[in-house]
């Protein structure tokens, strides 16, 4: 679910590092919202879009 359908941003993986430098796996999830978008053919569709794409104006809200 956590994937932007506009830019393809998805879950990133890495390490959580403690003060004693112990490492354990963790994930970073993108801030994805489900919004209604107006497509080029005039159709309305509900898709997952990250907030950076919404802020940049890459999608037109319906």
From Swiss-Prot:
Keywords, in A-Z order: Ribonucleoprotein, Ribosomal protein
Gene Ontology CC: ribonucleoprotein complex; ribosome
GO-annotated molecular function: structural constituent of ribosome
Pfam families on file: Ribosomal_L28
InterPro entries for this protein: Bacterial_rp_bL28, Ribosomal_bL28, Ribosomal_bL28/bL31-like_sf, Ribosomal_bL28_bact-type, Ribosomal_bL28_sf
UniProt KW Ribosomal protein keyword: yes
Gene3D superfamilies the record matches: Ribosomal protein L28/L24 (2.30.170.40)
Coiled-coil residue spans: none
One GO biological process term: translation
Record's keyword annotation contains Ribosomal protein: yes
PANTHER family attached to this UniProt entry: 50S RIBOSOMAL PROTEIN L28, LARGE RIBOSOMAL SUBUNIT PROTEIN BL28A
NCBIfam families reported in the protein's UniProt record: L28
Similarity annotation: Belongs to the bacterial ribosomal protein bL28 family.
The name this protein goes by in its record: Large ribosomal subunit protein bL28
Organism: Caldicellulosiruptor bescii (strain ATCC BAA-1888 / DSM 6725 / KCTC 15123 / Z-1320) (Anaerocellum thermophilum)
Gene (UniProt): rpmB
């Amino acid at each position: 679910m956590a994937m932007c359908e506009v830019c393809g941003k998805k879950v990133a993986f890495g390490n959580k590092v403690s003060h004693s430098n112990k490492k354990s796996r963790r994930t970073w999830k993108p801030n994805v919202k489900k919004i209604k978008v107006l497509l080029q053919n005039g159709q309305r569709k509900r898709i997952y879009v990250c907030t950076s794409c919404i802020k940049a104006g890459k999608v037109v809200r319906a």
